[in-house]
């Protein structure tokens, strides 16, 4: 199975999937449009969250970073007058240093991540969506902000006038992702932010055409008219989408077969048929590994009900 993932929402579903599927049968294609260089090292927030999840090192209270991490380097740099744009833990920083050294040696981001996954003892295949640089920028009233500056630096508070994924039209789907798509018909779009987490992946040239030939199941990150977490609602509105499960399904409608939305949602299950997909209700909140596992079992079973195009 191929899973499209950002750094929030989908990792909780991956937590359930790894309970029911052999790790070597999972390929996780991860958003890289939020990556940035900090203090000479490449930070890949979404990729690292997936790495820490599969290596059982993730901080489950925050669902990012390394559990029990310390921040001595960050604090020391502050004392020396160097203010970093992100609060990076020491163990987390070690990951960034190792990855950056791999890249400086001349290998691709994909190969650097595969090397890291091997170091962390991970059997699942974790792949960046592209080896080309892509960055998400938020158009706010006062400035154009990198997504990390908007979300971490400004706490997601500025009004969003637009979203621009710089470099996406020139970027290519990574060869390893293309290989995975050639060999697997099942694609799961996880409940990550549709605009800034999944959006860059499906906006890569040629990706939507490939997905039209696959069995595609998507899980909604929205319950009612609000996201479970993060700024998805504000971003969807800025992109002209209704902030609802229906709005998410509409965003994916070109290639979507089945859409999973929350059982508490008031959306009409049959309304999704107008978008050309079926819908399935489930508990999508994932408040525990057991809840994640239950959702994962339902989602995996749905693929057997789809006739491949």
Curated annotation (Swiss-Prot):
Pfam families: CofD. It is an enzyme of class 2 (transferase). Its cofactor is Mg(2+). It comes from the Archaea. 7,8-didemethyl-8-hydroxy-5-deazariboflavin binds at residues 48, 87. Keywords: Magnesium, Transferase. The keyword Nucleotidyltransferase does not apply. The keyword Magnesium applies. It catalyses: (2S)-lactyl-2-diphospho-5'-guanosine + 7,8-didemethyl-8-hydroxy-5-deazariboflavin = oxidized coenzyme F420-0 + GMP + H(+). GO terms for biological process: F420-0 metabolic process. Its EC number is 2.7.8.28. Gene3D superfamilies: CofD-like domain, CofD-like domains. GO terms for molecular function: LPPG:FO 2-phospho-L-lactate transferase activity; magnesium ion binding. Pathway: Cofactor biosynthesis; coenzyme F420 biosynthesis. Belongs to the CofD family. Catalyzes the transfer of the 2-phospholactate moiety from (2S)-lactyl-2-diphospho-5'-guanosine to 7,8-didemethyl-8-hydroxy-5-deazariboflavin (FO) with the formation of oxidized coenzyme F420-0 and GMP. HAMAP family: CofD (MF_01257). Homodimer. This is 2-phospho-L-lactate transferase. It comes from Methanosarcina barkeri (strain Fusaro / DSM 804).
């Amino acid at each position: 199975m191929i899973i499209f993932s950002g750094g929030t929402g989908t990792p909780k579903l991956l937590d359930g999937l790894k309970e029911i599927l052999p790790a070597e049968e999972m390929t996780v294609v991860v958003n890289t449009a939020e990556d940035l260089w900090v203090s000479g090292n490449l930070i890949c927030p979404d990729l690292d969250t997936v790495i820490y999840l599969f290596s059982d090192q993730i901080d489950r209270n925050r669902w990012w970073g390394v559990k029990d991490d310390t921040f001595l380097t960050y604090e020391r740099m502050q004392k020396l007058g160097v203010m970093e744009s992100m609060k990076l833990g020491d163990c987390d920083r070690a990951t960034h240093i190792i990855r950056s050294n791999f890249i400086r040696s001349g290998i691709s981001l994909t190969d650097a991540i595969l090397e890291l996954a091997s170091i962390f003892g991970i059997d699942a295949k974790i792949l960046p969506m592209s080896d080309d640089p892509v960055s998400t920028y938020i158009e706010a009233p006062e400035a154009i902000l990198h997504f990390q500056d908007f979300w971490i630096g400004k706490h997601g508070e500025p009004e969003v006038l637009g979203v621009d994924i710089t470099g996406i039209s020139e970027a290519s789907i990574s060869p390893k992702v293309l290989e995975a798509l050639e060999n697997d018909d099942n694609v799961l779009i996880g409940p990550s932010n549709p605009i800034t987490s999944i959006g860059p992946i499906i906006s890569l040239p040629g990706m939507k055409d490939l997905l039209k030939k696959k069995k595609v199941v998507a899980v909604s990150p929205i319950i009612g008219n609000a996201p479970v977490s993060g700024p998805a609602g504000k971003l969807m509105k800025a992109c002209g989408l209704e902030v609802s499960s229906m709005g998410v399904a509409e965003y994916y409608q070109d290639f979507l077969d089945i859409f999973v939305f929350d059982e508490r949602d008031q959306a009409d299950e049959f309304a999704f048929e107008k978008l050309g997909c079926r819908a399935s209700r489930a508990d999508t909140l994932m408040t525990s590994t057991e809840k994640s596992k239950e959702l994962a079992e339902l989602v995996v079973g749905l693929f057997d009900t789809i006739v491949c195009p």
